């Protein structure tokens, strides 16, 4: 492994922050990978919930964009990107829409906790640029995602999922599909 050359643009950017950004990049890519797995599961012919598939594919793209935004920040601040292996999702069979939404909720809470820890590190290292970046691009979006997923879990449960297959079909069609006829 070659050592990265020192940056001429680096200023007030602590090595701990740089390392934490690299870990966050990996976590965002892992989240993207999990959502991609969920999307493919719901797109299977024996599951056939196309709006669950679309929803999770959209989430996958969002998480990848989060990782790319962090990579751009790393380069702007004079840090160096060191990519790690992306962990395989814990499962391939997501069982039901309700289970996938519960797993997604847990995942988003984990990502949010990691971002909060990154923000605390930036505060401790007196890095207002990093604090502002996290606040502007991530924290509010995470709270909205967690609320949306929590609502989806509640609504699926109220409709009788996972015992009622009709509940997931109707949720797929009318909530995730926004009532579309396609």
Curated annotation (Swiss-Prot):
Entry binding sites for Fe cation 2: 63, 108, 142
Keyword set, alphabetical order: Acetylation, Cytoplasm, Cytoplasmic vesicle, Iron, Iron storage, Lysosome, Metal-binding, Oxidoreductase
GO CC, any one term: membrane
Transmembrane segments: none
EC number: 1.16.3.1
The Ferritin-like diiron domain, residue ranges: 11-160
Positions of modified residues (N-acetylthreonine): 2
GO biological process: immune response; intracellular iron ion homeostasis; iron ion transport; negative regulation of cell population proliferation; negative regulation of ferroptosis; negative regulation of fibroblast proliferation
Subcellular location: Cytoplasm; Lysosome; Cytoplasmic vesicle, Autophagosome
Top-level taxon of the source organism: Eukaryota
PTM sites of type N-acetylmethionine: 1
SUPFAM superfamilies xref list: Ferritin-like (SSF47240)
Keyword Oxidoreductase found: yes
Catalysed reactions, semicolon-separated: 4 Fe(2+) + O2 + 4 H(+) = 4 Fe(3+) + 2 H2O
InterPro entries to which the protein is assigned, alphabetical: Ferritin, Ferritin-like, Ferritin-like_diiron, Ferritin-like_SF, Ferritin_CS, Ferritin_DPS_dom
Entry function: Stores iron in a soluble, non-toxic, readily available form. Important for iron homeostasis. Has ferroxidase activity. Iron is taken up in the ferrous form and deposited as ferric hydroxides after oxidation. Also plays a role in delivery of iron to cells. Mediates iron uptake in capsule cells of the developing kidney. Delivery to lysosomes is mediated by the cargo receptor NCOA4 for autophagic degradation and release of iron.
Sequence similarity: Belongs to the ferritin family.
PANTHER family with a match to the protein in the record: FERRITIN, FERRITIN HEAVY CHAIN
Subunit composition and interactions: Oligomer of 24 subunits. There are two types of subunits: L (light) chain and H (heavy) chain. The major chain can be light or heavy, depending on the species and tissue type. The functional molecule forms a roughly spherical shell with a diameter of 12 nm and contains a central cavity into which the insoluble mineral iron core is deposited. Interacts with NCOA4; NCOA4 promotes targeting of the iron-binding ferritin complex to autolysosomes following starvation or iron depletion.
Protein name in UniProt: Ferritin heavy chain
